[in-house]
Amino acid sequence: MHSVYQHWDPLKVCAVGRSFPPEFYSRIKNSKVRNAMERVAIETEEDYQKIISKLEEFNVEIVRTDISENVDDYCNDQGIVVAPPPMCPRDFTAMVGNKFYMPGGNYAKNFDVNEIVDKLLFKIAQKKFSNVSDPLVCKLAQKIEDILEPNHGLSPKSSLLKFQSRVTDKFKTFLYKDQEYPFWQVKHIVDFTELKELIIQAKCQTIYSNIKFPNNKHFYAFKSIEEWLNKNNVPIVYDEYINSATMTRVGKDLYFGNVNLIDGLNQDSLKVKWQKLFPNYRINTCNGIGGHVDGHFCPVVPGLILTLRDPKMFEETFPDWEVVSMPDEGWKKVEGFTKMKNKVRGKWWIAGEEDNDDLIDYIETWLHDWVSYVEETVFDVNMLVIDEKNVMCNGYNKVVFDTFDRYGITPHVINFRHRYFWDGGLHCNTSDISRFGDMKDFFPERD
């Protein structure tokens, strides 16, 4: 029987991601950009193989995500690659107990974001004071007021009261620039795109762009994983948006982070969902931690946490555990690169951008300067724990390695050179499917 209860139990079976091969970049006309991306592709697969080789030293069985050989499976009608490669299986999967949660055919289809927005608008139209207790309604009202009255400086709750004061009781119209408009026209005046993006991200428990590889209907990246699960009689739960990048498994306790603002606002309703999915667990929320929790902290073994955050954040959730903080590590050390990256994100795929000087400078700077800098100076808490005595990490940090030595832990350095180029560390690039061990209760006083 296959299961995962603690992510420091001995690893048996592990999924490993996969990126595009160098041939996928043959359409890029500018040789500087094409050659650079081909190099990134080659080195990325080399580093995946290093991960695999290290895991196989510990007799871990490997299952990889799948890549189509046809680049058109990742392109839109204009021939631009819009679907990213399945590099980070953990961002979309999780083994919780003996069930594996993963994307299926209804990924991002089993909810209607427009219907969600319509229901929120309907609640606003009712003008009930009780709406102030619905944080998502308040956030929607604030978004509307941002358009109707820029720079209003109102809080979400105050925005709700302000907008509801615009709405007439009898005819359900609202005042805008001294004119009355039918209430439904608010959908034509206000652009809800950004809000909808946040709602989708919160629903799918993902971060950044909603263009993720599970959305690719031309090719299913989890076919090999699905076949392995079926062959080994592992129950599969599709499209519940549970993953072990936003959730940490510590025996009977599950810890969930907030993906974004909307996720934080909906924390109570999400907690109800999690309690229904996991009735035999205690559900904990990591307040103050947004995005993927595995990029902020790692419970390495019982009693020890490594984090980029303030140790005080863990006093209630992990009482009496040692918390080793490294506030200046991780993304903070590559802020210069991330500014460049945000400026040219994804443009190497776009026809006409091949001669973009910013793009060329970005790629060349990454390959010539940042790759070696990251290898030598940046430590990442996005680590893969093989067992209680062996941890896979991206580099050296004296404080961390001294701590490991006190706990009898051997660090295995696997430098995933393009981790910050692809936004995926060693933990994200893998997903533990099976570990030895049964559920333990590290905080029995909570019952």
What are these regions (language model features)?
Residues M1-D447:
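The feature marks the mature, well-folded catalytic cores of soluble enzymes
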